[in-house]
From Swiss-Prot:
The keyword Nucleotidyltransferase does not apply. Belongs to the NrdR family. The lineage of its organism: Bacteria, Bacillati, Bacillota, Bacilli, Lactobacillales. Pfam families: ATP-cone (PF03477), Zn_ribbon_NrdR (PF22811). This is Transcriptional repressor NrdR. The keyword Disulfide bond does not apply.
């Protein structure tokens, strides 16, 4: 490691410890030439993930951009910031687990919508209306009907969490 003071290429590590989140190693170093002490940080370099946009342009995956879209769709809804960041974490983990260097923005949008559908229906519809660019009211209504059908299927399946006995009719 080159000394920032005298530019000598030799240094020794005096102290090494992980940071609070454990993702970065902080190292105190001392120059072998002039004795100047300095700090370096070592972290795993994430492979850049490129998003292929609808127009074919490519840009680096941006967590903040995904989060902004979710925040906009959940505006004035009972969805916590923690939940929204959790969605972004889940989407990013899912995308990175595919092992690809490039992914289409459509796939990312679908992953976000899968998550939002289970969290808040209004946020889901808002996100879908921007993401899918509904051309007219009929396309919008079709999306609502699909959502209502999914709800019916969910309601028809008995929940494993149900522990109480069904209510009996009074005679």
């Amino acid at each position: 490691m080159q000394c920032p003071h005298c530019h000598h290429n030799g240094s020794r590590v005096v102290d090494s410890r992980p940071t609070d989140d454990g993702r970065v190693i902080r190292r105190r170093r001392e120059c072998e030439n002039c004795g100047f002490r300095f700090t370096t940080f070592e972290r795993v370099e994430a492979t850049p993930l490129l998003v292929i946009k609808k127009n074919g342009a490519r840009e680096e995956f941006n967590r903040e951009k995904v989060l902004r879209g979710i925040i906009r769709s959940a505006e004035k809804r009972p969805v916590s910031m923690e939940t929204m960041t959790g969605v972004v974490d889940d989407v990013e983990n899912k995308v990175r687990s595919l092992g690809e260097n490039e992914i289409s923005s459509q796939v990312i949008g679908e992953y976000v919508m899968e998550q939002l559908a289970d969290i808040d229906e209004i946020s889901y519809i808002r996100f879908a209306s921007v993401y899918r660019q509904f051309k007219d009211m009929h396309v919008f209504l079709n999306e609502l009907q699909d959502m209502m059908e999914r709800d019916k299927v969910k309601l028809a399946k008995p929940s494993a969490k149900t522990t109480h006995a069904p209510k009996r009719k009074k005679d």
